[in-house]
């Protein structure tokens, strides 16, 4: 397990960044999850679940199934568990994507929100995700930091851990190499207006934030080969 990543995301958990990530990404996450076709009896894995907000959204769809969230940060997982006590169809585990502690062909759907670019060995992680999926199952990932969304490139120098800046074509190729088919890429827009008095540490200016919003989040999905 990547100790540098675990340490950093444990710090994020203590700083409340799991909850701020929900505030920032939930409008896009809701749209992405709605497009996945999760059924009431689906078996779903949320990779890089953080504080578990997307896991709980998925659990609302798979209310007669099961949703498992994993994260490399034990402190994020603890917060996810504490926030999900009302959900009987949810569980969480501390694990990294490159070595998933699950059986082959276990899940009908896999979701990942804002985590792919942190993986040290993304090809291995994608192959592991493919391994644990049932044939014909859907994997959908959302990322904001990608080559075509230039405004997000400024994040790279502010992060304490290395990240992978990839293009849409890069992601498509990696999905294909991992065994996925029927690859789709689409943009999802956050419908909230940008405040006139926007100030934040995420972007250097309001103009940068507007450009980021206009470019949209990248959702890339693929089906596990039958």
Model-derived regions: residue spans:
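Core SAM-dependent methyltransferase catalytic element
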Residues: 197-226
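A short glycine-rich, Lys/Arg-flanked "PGG" loop and its adjoining helix->strand segment in the class I
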Residues: 123-135
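Conserved beta-strand signature within the Rossmann-like core of class I S-adenosyl-L-methionine
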Residues: 137-143
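Conserved class I S-adenosyl-L-methionine
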Residues: 1-39, 53-57, 76-79, 83, ...
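A conserved beta-strand element that flanks and buttresses the S-adenosyl-L-methionine
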Residues: 111
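Short alpha-helix
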Residues: 163-179
């Amino acid at each position: 397990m990547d100790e540098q990543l675990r340490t950093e995301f444990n710090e994020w958990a203590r700083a409340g960044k799991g909850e701020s990530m929900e505030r920032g990404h939930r409008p896009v996450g809701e749209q992405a999850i709605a497009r996945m076709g999760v059924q009431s009896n689906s078996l779903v894995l949320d990779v890089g679940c953080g504080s578990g907000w997307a896991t709980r959204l998925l659990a609302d769809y798979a209310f007669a199934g099961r949703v498992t969230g994993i994260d490399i940060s034990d402190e994020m997982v603890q917060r996810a568990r504490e926030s999900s006590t009302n959900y009987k169809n949810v569980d969480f585990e501390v694990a990294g994507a490159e070595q998933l502690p699950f059986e082959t062909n276990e899940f009908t759907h896999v979701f990942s929100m804002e985590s792919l670019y942190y993986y040290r060995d993304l090809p291995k992680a994608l192959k592991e995700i493919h391994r644990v999926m049932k044939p014909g199952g859907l994997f959908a990932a959302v990322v904001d930091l990608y080559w075509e969304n230039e405004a997000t490139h400024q994040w790279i120098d502010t992060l304490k851990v290395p990240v992978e800046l990839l293009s849409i074509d890069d992601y498509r190729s990696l999905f294909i190499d991992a065994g996925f088919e029927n690859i789709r890429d689409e943009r999802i827009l956050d419908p909230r207006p940008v405040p006139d008095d926007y100030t934040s540490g995420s972007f250097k200016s309001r103009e940068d934030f507007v450009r980021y919003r206009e470019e949209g989040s990248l959702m890339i999905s693929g089906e596990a080969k039958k």
